[in-house]
A protein has these predicted regions:
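N-terminal targeting signals for export/organelle localization
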Residues: 1-57, 224
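Short, small/polar residue-rich loop motifs at catalytic or cofactor-binding pockets
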Residues: 55-57, 78-79, 177-179
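Hydrophobic beta-strand positions
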Residues: 61-62, 184
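Short active-site neighborhood of thiol/selenol oxidoreductases, capturing the structured segment around
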Residues: 70-100, 115-116
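Structural micro-motif
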Residues: 144, 155, 161-167, 177-183
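Thiol-/selenol-based redox modules, centered on thioredoxin-like
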Residues: 170-224
Length: 224
């Protein structure tokens, strides 16, 4: 009798362990790796539409608000959030920048995380202009680079790497209208999410807000 009782306890314990394991697996948090195949074809350059899990942000070299050359190597091994803007924009940019400042405050003490904002009007947004803009907005130089550079290269990386603008006619290749998207990039240069840069915490079906972005950044930070 005692033997059967011990056996019953063993099986009950085993079932509890199995149940907990299954529950943990079903509820384990994951964050997708986003590739060109996963994105609306209108937002993907035809040259990269076929790329799957090998897709990463391409090498780049731009100049930041301090006149320093910034390359992909400065972001290697870091989690970062990228967006596209221009300093004289009077529509969505002011709100996007305010929200990036909000995000900067959330991640300023996390050494694993940085920010990267690309000007889509690089000829107008010179180093001097970006420096003034950065001071006005309270940019922390060690955390957030506002970059300018070759217009074609900026537009190319927006279309082929970050997948954030519609591909127009050939003659419109370098006439980009930037979106409100914030792009989350992981330590390996892979896209892990798109977020509405105008929305901090409002729930909108089919899109992620910036509060969710902070949560996803924390998730990636803990995994590293």
């Amino acid at each position: 009798m005692f033997k059967y009782k011990k056996l019953s306890i063993f099986f009950v314990g085993l079932l509890v362990v199995i149940f907990i394991s299954i529950y943990t697996l079903l509820n384990r948090r994951t964050l997708p790796i986003i590739t060109p195949r996963d994105v609306n074809p209108e937002l993907v350059d035809s040259l990269v539409q076929h790329i799957g899990y090998k897709h990463k942000i391409a090498p780049f070299a731009f100049t930041n608000q301090n006149g320093k050359k910034i390359t992909n190597k400065d972001y290697y091994g870091k989690i970062y959030v990228a967006d596209f803007f221009f300093t004289t924009c009077q529509t969505i940019c002011p709100k996007m920048t305010d929200n990036m400042v909000w995000l900067q405050d959330k991640i300023k003490n996390n050494p694993k995380v940085k920010l990267l904002s690309h000007s889509v009007f690089p000829d107008e947004d010179t180093v001097e202009v970006l420096k003034k803009y950065a001071k006005e907005k309270g940019v922390i130089d060690e955390k957030w680079n506002l970059v300018t550079g070759n217009q074609k290269e900026i537009y190319k990386i927006a279309r082929q790497s970050y997948l954030v603008v519609k591909t127009g006619k050939p003659e419109e290749m370098y006439d980009m209208v930037h979106t409100e998207n914030f792009v989350l990039v992981d330590q390996k240069g892979r896209i892990r999410g798109f977020y509405n840069g105008l929305n901090i915490d409002k729930t909108v079906k089919g899109e992620k807000n910036l509060t969710q972005l902070v949560e996803d950044i924390e998730f990636l930070s803990e995994k590293d």
